[in-house]
Amino acid sequence: MDVEKAQAIENSMMCLTIFSRSIHTFFALANVLGHLDRGTGDLFPFRGVCNALIGDAAIHWCKVFGSDAEATHWKCVIDDHDGFRKFLFEELRTTPTEFHAYWKKMTEFRSNVIAHFNAEHFSNGSTPEFDTAIAAAATAHKYM
C-alpha cells in the first residue's frame, strides 16, 4: 500500500473516530440533561453542548458515508466497492434500499438542520436514529 492510500484511510478513520466520540458523548450527556442544566436559568448550556455534539457526529459520519466527492468518503479509500457494500449490508442486516433510505435521512438532517438552516425541514423533519450510523461506522472501521 502506498503512502497516499494509507493517509487517505487514516483520514477516513479519523472521521469515524470523531463521529464515534461525539455521538457517544452526546448519549452520555443527553441522559442527564435535566440534572446538568438545573440552575442555569434560560441558558441550558449542556443542551447546547449536546446539540453541537450531534451536529458534529452527523457531519463526520457524512464525511465517510455522505457525498462521493469527499476525499474521506469510503469509495475514495476502499477499492472493492461491491465487496464493502456486501459486507456493510450483511453486518447491518439491511438491504441496499433500506440503507439508502437511512442515508437520505442522515444527509438531509446534516444539510437542512446542521450545515444550513432550512426552516421547513427544521419544523417538519426529525432527527434520525443514530444506531444505524454507529453500526455503519463500526463496520467501515472493521473493513478498512
Where are these regions (language model features)?
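Amphipathic alpha-helical interface segments
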Residues: 1-105, 127-144
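Histidine-centered, metal-coordinating catalytic motifs and their short helical/loop contexts
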Residues: 96-124
